[in-house]
Amino acid sequence: MRPGLQPSLGLTSSSLPDDALEVGRILDAWGVKGWVKILPHSTDPEALFSAKTWYLQTPDVKFRPGFSLFSGTVSLKVDEAKIHSGAVVAKFSGLDDRDAAEALRGARIFLSRSSFPAASADEYYWVDLIGLNVLNREGVALGCVRDLMATGPHSVLCVEYASTQEDGTSATAERMIPFVAAYVDKVDIAGKCITVDWQPDY
């Protein structure tokens, strides 16, 4: 952290909460009054709107080589976060001009899981589904949820599994399972498992 910079920007040296989840990154400054534009990792940015404290870590080098504004983890108080013209934008306490906002470009955003609003019945945050094992009704393991993607009316589970190529070598493959009631029987977050009506050869 460069001397004198942290207080002027409202940055506070911190450490990530034990339940921290990476939810996006700062794309760029937005406007001239210290607002920033956010790239969320999920199509549902509700957690960004409810959390009053965000945690930032240095950008991936490919997004922002030579970043030196801070090192480690810092926290910021959020004055406001909202959607404007289809983009998520936010204003932090202590960041009041475009130069200050541009200085954060590329920073990775983390939130405490405890700050997420409660999901409705039969609704789940993507971050809670990633990493769950997927089994079908017969108990056959179909793989592990690597990611999800939005396809208009519903989400799709990207399930990664081990496979064997024609030459006998091991490889990793992926199957797509629509995350809809017609195929998903049960989601057990505590048990880290999703049961689906799906066959390995689909």
From Swiss-Prot:
UniProtKB keywords: Chaperone, Cytoplasm, Ribosome biogenesis, rRNA processing
PRC barrel domain segment(s): 121-202
Localization per Swiss-Prot or TrEMBL: Cytoplasm
GO molecular function, one term: ribosome binding
InterPro entries for the chain: PRC_barrel-like_sf, PRC_RimM, RimM, RimM_N, RimM_N_sf, Transl_B-barrel_sf
Gene3D superfamilies noted in UniProt: PRC-barrel domain (2.30.30.240), RimM (2.40.30.60)
This protein's record includes keyword Cell inner membrane: no
Pfam families named among the record's database cross-references: PRC_RimM, RimM
Stored SUPFAM superfamilies: PRC-barrel domain, Translation proteins
GO CC term, one of those recorded: cytoplasm
Stored NCBIfam families: 16S_RimM (TIGR02273)
Function recorded in the entry: An accessory protein needed during the final step in the assembly of 30S ribosomal subunit, possibly for assembly of the head region. Essential for efficient processing of 16S rRNA. May be needed both before and after RbfA during the maturation of 16S rRNA. It has affinity for free ribosomal 30S subunits but not for 70S ribosomes.
Family of the protein in this entry: Belongs to the RimM family.
Domain notes: The PRC barrel domain binds ribosomal protein uS19.
Subunit details: Binds ribosomal protein uS19.
HAMAP family found in the cross-reference section: Ribosome_mat_RimM
Official protein name in the record: Ribosome maturation factor RimM
Organism: Polaromonas naphthalenivorans (strain CJ2)
